[in-house]
Amino acid sequence: ICRSTACGEISVAVKAIEGGRFSRYARDEIKPGMALEVMVPQGHFGYQPQAEREGHYLAIAAGSGITPMLAIMSATLATEAHSHFTLIYGNRSSQSMMFRRALADLKDKYPQRLQLISIFSQETLDSDLLHGRIDGEKLHALAKTLVNFRQYDEAFICGPSAMMDEAEAALKALGMPEKAIHLERFNTPGTPVKRTVSVQADGQKVTVRQDGRD
């Protein structure tokens, strides 16, 4: 779910990935007008904005991990008029970034309360700080020059498992309490790939003795 429920609609983003089960089905099989049987949303990842609250929030996402963050950020900034949000978002390049236009629009709407930090792994940038992947080393580097991680009341992390594990460890090391760090894991194991295996067996003669007989 990638939009705030306050808009009265439910929008779901699906990014097809190599070996993905549902993502490939959604891309190739689901068509406009189809009726789908769905369950209620699962898990406890998210945040319920409170109009009277003034908070500082952090989101760390990579790739399609931006999906729940967009809903959380837009709902929080719309409801909590004095709260601030920082998004650290990792992608291969600006062209591969999901919701690039939506994020730009959100930044234009809340220029003083939303900070966007984009990290690109396959795009040449003037600053080495913004080049590479989001990992523990990158977050510690950001802490030295650009981001005060101790200021945040809540942190939300979503993306590849390795990134999430390193980000969680880095935030703890940088002073954030564990209870303030929330993770969303939605990856599933890839579909097993069938392989043809050739086995070459050399003939061997074996004598088996049972009850004294060969």
Segments and roles (model prediction):
Residues V40-F45:
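Short, charged beta-turn/beta-strand-edge "cap" motif at the junction between a beta-strand
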Residues I1-A35, M39, E52-G55, S83, ...:
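Ferredoxin-reductase
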Residues Y57-T67:
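Short, glycine-rich nucleotide/cofactor-binding loops
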Residues S11, E37, L58, H84-I88, ...:
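A structural signal for isolated positions on well-ordered beta-strands in alpha/beta enzyme cores
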Residues Q50-Y57, F149-Y152:
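Short helix-loop-beta connector
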Residues E9, E54-Y57, L77-F85, K107, ...:
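A short alpha->loop->secondary-structure connector
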Residues Q95-D214:
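Reductase modules of NAD(P)H-dependent flavoproteins
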Residues I66-A78:
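Histidine-anchored nucleotide/phosphate-binding helix
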